[in-house]
């Protein structure tokens, strides 16, 4: 029988193995989720909120342990893992506190009688999530659906099975009934089979563009609502009036975040030609000299990538970029020894037509561009198939907002890399996917917005 392994990317050690579930086992899990849904949806908001509050409390109490699990299972810096767990607790609390208000009936104006929208749960949701934020991704999917009254069957990435198992245990301990949230151990090849199950009513995926296209096709074939959060190639535009030191520090720290394995990481830094030489020099010193090492060491700035394969994929992209004419300013090599470590890397002179110009590089690679003016910066920022996030960095905030309005993405941050907060929607445009998660937008994705009209027999049709 095939198994799913969890491997420490800093050492290469196999930590644990889980047998893959059979189709019949998964079918039984879906049956339980469907059965639980019929009762869970009847619970009051306060009863469902209690589970979310408890989950938040448990996560905060165990943040050191859970943060360490992020480190040993996918290589995240321990302090970043702890911050991720704190964020998850905040998301659970946000929906516990606001769910009933957000889902209250919405009156509609009508000339006769009255009408309103009633927001109702739809059933079992299949959620397929990636490894780069092993607790945040599952929380982002679980919290709004649980408060709505849906149930979740979650397939986590194959390299973070312990995190997937742990989230189910946390929610059960928090008081969720069996079947409200169930983690499954299956390969990606089983997903379309699950989407064929008529008991599954909705589908959410965060992952690569090819995975998203396949997932959406399988969901669409079954006429099921889906949301996708896919790749990104976020631009970080530096305005001419920017504080250079702060701009460099913000861009570099944003790219070091999670070893560059973040969909909204500032992958393309776009700098006015007047600031470019100084920016490049400062960025090379700060980024190129980042301390690489053990994710559990508080002094480490750059942890390993999630796997040796992930590192080799990134290095291959860097090598191809250089072969196609890009300039390698710093890094570009693997670090010898155990683990999936590589040097922080800076590329410049990237031109349209090169693979690096259009592809997402999911690792610690900073691409820096020089432009003549802000019009050119906006054109470059938009010249991508992706449309997830982005940054405009400058002193004149009013002008920065004007530039932000011209960027074709789902999110733009002023003077900060694209971030995450429970009350703010998260999602993109173009090939970065569709739909939104978090905030009021996220809670409406998997509900039946039912119109209820009260009128009389003689009213107009």
Label each PLM-derived region with a short phrase:
Residues 1-113:
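N-terminal Rossmann-like NAD(P)+-binding subdomain of aldehyde/semialdehyde dehydrogenases
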Residues 105-246, 371:
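Rossmann-like NAD(P) dinucleotide-binding subdomain of oxidoreductase/dehydrogenase enzymes
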Residues 1-4, 266, 388:
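Short loop/turn microsegments at loop-to-beta-strand junctions
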Residues 34-37, 41, 56-63, 67, ...:
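Structural signal for hydrophobic packing residues in well-ordered secondary-structure cores
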Residues 11-17, 334, 341-461:
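Conserved C-terminal structural/oligomerization subdomain of aldehyde/semialdehyde dehydrogenase
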Residues 15, 210-351, 414, 460-461:
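ALDH superfamily catalytic-core signature
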Residues 12, 48, 70, 92, ...:
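Residue-level signal for inorganic ion chemistry
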Residues 16-21, 36-42, 127, 236-238, ...:
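Short, well-ordered beta-strand elements within core beta-sheets of diverse protein domains
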């Amino acid at each position: 029988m095939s198994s799913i392994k969890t491997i420490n990317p800093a050492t290469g050690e196999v930590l644990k193995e889980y047998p893959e579930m059979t189709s019949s086992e998964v079918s039984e899990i879906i049956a339980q989720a469907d059965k639980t849904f019929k009762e869970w949806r009847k619970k009051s908001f306060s009863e469902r909120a209690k589970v979310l509050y408890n989950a938040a409390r448990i996560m905060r109490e165990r943040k050191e342990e859970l943060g360490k699990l992020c480190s040993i299972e996918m290589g995240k810096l321990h302090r970043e893992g702890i911050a991720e767990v704190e964020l998850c607790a905040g998301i659970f609390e946000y929906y516990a506190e606001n769910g009933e208000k957000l889902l209250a009936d919405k009156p509609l104006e009508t000339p006769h009688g009255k009408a309103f929208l009633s927001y109702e749960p739809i059933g079992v949701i299949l959620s397929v999530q990636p490894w780069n934020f092993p607790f945040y991704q599952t929380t982002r999917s679980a919290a709004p659906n649980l408060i709505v009254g849906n149930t979740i069957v979650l397939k986590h990435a194959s390299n973070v099975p312990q995190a997937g198992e742990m989230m189910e245990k946390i929610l059960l301990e928090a008081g969720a009934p069996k079947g409200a949230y169930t983690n499954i151990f299956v390969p990606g090849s089983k997903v379309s089979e699950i989407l064929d199950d008529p008991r599954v009513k909705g589908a959410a995926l965060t992952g690569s563009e090819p995975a998203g296209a396949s997932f959406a096709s399988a969901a669409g074939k079954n006429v099921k609502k889906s949301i996708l959060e896919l790749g990104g190639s976020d631009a970080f535009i530096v305005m001419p009036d920017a504080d250079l030191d702060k701009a460099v520090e913000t861009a570099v720290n944003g790219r070091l975040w999670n070893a560059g394995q973040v969909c909204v990481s500032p992958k393309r830094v776009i700098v006015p030609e007047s600031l470019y030489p100084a920016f490049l020099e400062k960025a090379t010193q700060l980024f190129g000299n980042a301390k690489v090492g053990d994710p559990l060491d508080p002094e480490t700035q750059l942890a390993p990538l999630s796997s040796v394969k992930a590192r080799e994929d990134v290095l291959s992209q860097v090598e191809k970029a250089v072969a196609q004419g890009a300039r390698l300013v710093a890094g570009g090599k693997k670090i010898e020894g155990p683990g999936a470590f590589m040097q922080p890397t800076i590329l410049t002179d990237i031109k349209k037509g090169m693979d690096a110009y259009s592809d997402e590089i999911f690792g610690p690679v900073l691409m820096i561009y020089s432009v003549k003016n802000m019009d050119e910066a906006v054109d470059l920022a938009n010249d991508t198939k992706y449309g997830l996030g982005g940054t405009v960095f400058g002193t004149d905030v009013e002008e920065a907002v004007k530039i932000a309005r011209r960027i074709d993405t789902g999110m733009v941050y002023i003077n900060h890399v694209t971030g995450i907060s429970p009350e703010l929607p998260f999602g993109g445009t173009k090939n970065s996917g569709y739909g939104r998660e978090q905030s009021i937008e996220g809670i409406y994705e998997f509900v039946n917005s039912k119109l209820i009209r009260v009128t009389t027999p003689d009213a107009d049709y």
